[in-house]
Amino acid sequence: MPSDHGFLTSLGLEFAYFSGLPWLRGRRASGAGVVMRFERVRPARAARFQPLRSHEITPEFLDRTIRALKRWKFDIVSMDEACQRAVRLASPRRFACLTFDGGYKDLITSAYPVLSRHDVPFTVYIPTAFPDGVGEAWWLALEAVIARETRISLVMDRREQRFDIANTPEKYQLYDFLVDWMRSLAPPDLSAAIKDLCTRYAVGLSALSRDASMDWSDLAKLAADPLVTIGSATVNYPVLSNLKDADALREITMGRAVAQAAFHREVRHFAYPFGDRGSWRRQHAAMAEEAGFASAASAIPGVVESEGRTNLHALPRIAWDGRRRSLRAMRVIVSGVTFAPVKRARATGA
């Protein structure tokens, strides 16, 4: 839902653009480049309730983004190349690496035609339960329930709770509240909670999750393209910080093993599910390195530094807010001017 905070942030980015600040910042302070994080790419919708709008861009905006990055003299590179530039001496040109999380079906139907037309490399991170047809996109199911109902009830902490959601602001408020609650649950409890909610309100969790996700045939098409890097995002896409260490390591290693078996190639790159600061911890970076990944991408914003100053197993990414359509705002963000300087990375095992 649009907010005063979002408006002020956008206004600040526009002001920064016209102030010339991105061009006054030194080349070293701007980093070697940026890794950009996208999720869904699909045509704009007219629905008033779109709690995941910030996670979506249109194919037209993806096209504008790629054209702009080229115009701004960014080299659009693969994840392998991004990791190499992160440890080398600074290059005269900055890079941009395009990544897509979630394994959504619209990547193949809406994003891939745009990416192919521009002949640019990109990385897609796959939680392998979803192409297997057994993943649970609980955030989509929650959206479907709240969008359709004016009153819902569910069991929270062993107590029946009821919520009136007669208008759109109330729907947004409840969605945010329940997402925060569900993200705090251990995976078995989260699965039980969303299945109970879907049963009560006749939302087909399994069908919805399958329909929203690429299957293995879609992924095989992508894997056949030399410009596409297939990465892993665990098996079930859990909040790793809610798991015991042994379970988290199993999710990380099994996700890689399943993907490698499916594509008959090494899977070198990983993305933390959700990826924000609360969803993973330092020990998970060590696990990703132990599992054999060359990189592990977060959703923590920042630029990638050269000369080894960025920890490749805590790789920052710029998650673009799909509610923003200003390329001026994007140019400010990719300049690095909005991010604090990065301290030299230490080995994850230290």
Model-derived segments and their meaning:
Residues 125, 230-232, 297-299:
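Active-site neighborhood of phospho(di)ester-bond hydrolases with catalytic His/Asp-centered motifs
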Residues 110-114, 218, 283-287:
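A short acidic, amphipathic alpha-helical/loop segment
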Residues 27-33, 37, 135-225:
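Extended, charge-rich helix/loop segments that form flexible
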